[in-house]
Amino acid sequence: MTYELKGGAFPVVVCQLADGEKMVTEKGSMVWMSPNMEMSTSGGGLGKMFSKAFSGESMFQNIYTAHGAGMIAFGSSFPGRILPLTIQPGQEVILQKAAFLAAETGVNLSVHFNKKMGTGFFGGEGFIMQRLSGSGVAFAEVDGELVEYTLGPGQQMVVDTGNVLGFEGGVSIDIQQVKGLKNKLLGGEGFFNTVLTGPGKIWLQTMPISGVASALIPYIPTCGNN
């Protein structure tokens, strides 16, 4: 499989497949394809279906198979970027649960539960995430622009939870309480931040869709407004 990223701030990834090659996606993100691509739907087994239902994900995956040389394009659902990730055997990448776009079928997608329960209960989106393992190329949706850092052993980055796109498996995630009652009540940044600790790469996004939705709420007409 070869691929090309197109579209700027409204991106698509166009994948060229050889005969018999397959791509998988969870969210119906296919935007166009050649007529010799065949789609099938799989639940991935009862255990995987249960874990996906628990995490709020779709319980089914769409698998696209090329019969002869074929082409298929996957589009992002929000303005931003598409991040290609090459997954090597023994390597893991953890993503926010809505970030996965598509992958080669050699990439295994599973639910990742953070070991520290407070990360999810107090940190918001970070408790249930997605784990990519196996071997192959995967693509992740980025809300807004992408910023990448490589953390050394013990090096930390404090991030608003919604701005965390993902990180390598060697990076640990925790929460940090914002200090000071005045900061909590008047700072407008919430009560908790996410702390990522190296070693490994982390990927951050500049405009999480949750933040955009919150910013638009005051401008949405209600029954009491003219």
Predicted features along the sequence, with ranges:
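Composition-driven recognition of glycine/serine/threonine/acidic- and proline-rich low-complexity segments
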Residues: 1-226
